[in-house]
Amino acid sequence: MDHRLLEIIACPVCNGKLWYNQEKQELICKLDKLAFPLRDGIPVLLETEARVLTSEESQS
């Protein structure tokens, strides 16, 4: 994931900052507690494709 891209893109729900989880290949919105998948290195920034973070994940 190109870190320059992270400076440009935002959460499609709240327009907040996204954080990259390299282990899970996801972009995380801590405000909405959503994880957006990366498929073949491409962020899928659709709310319908996002998963809700567990309470443990949202606290870290």
UniProtKB/Swiss-Prot annotation:
This is UPF0434 protein YcaR. InterPro entries: Trm112-like. It comes from the Bacteria. It comes from Escherichia fergusonii (strain ATCC 35469 / DSM 13698 / CCUG 18766 / IAM 14443 / JCM 21226 / LMG 7866 / NBRC 102419 / NCTC 12128 / CDC 0568-73). PANTHER family: PROTEIN PREY, MITOCHONDRIAL (PTHR33505:SF4), ZGC:162634 (PTHR33505). Gene3D superfamilies: 2.20.25.10. It holds the Pfam family Trm112p. GO terms for cellular component: cytosol. Belongs to the UPF0434 family.
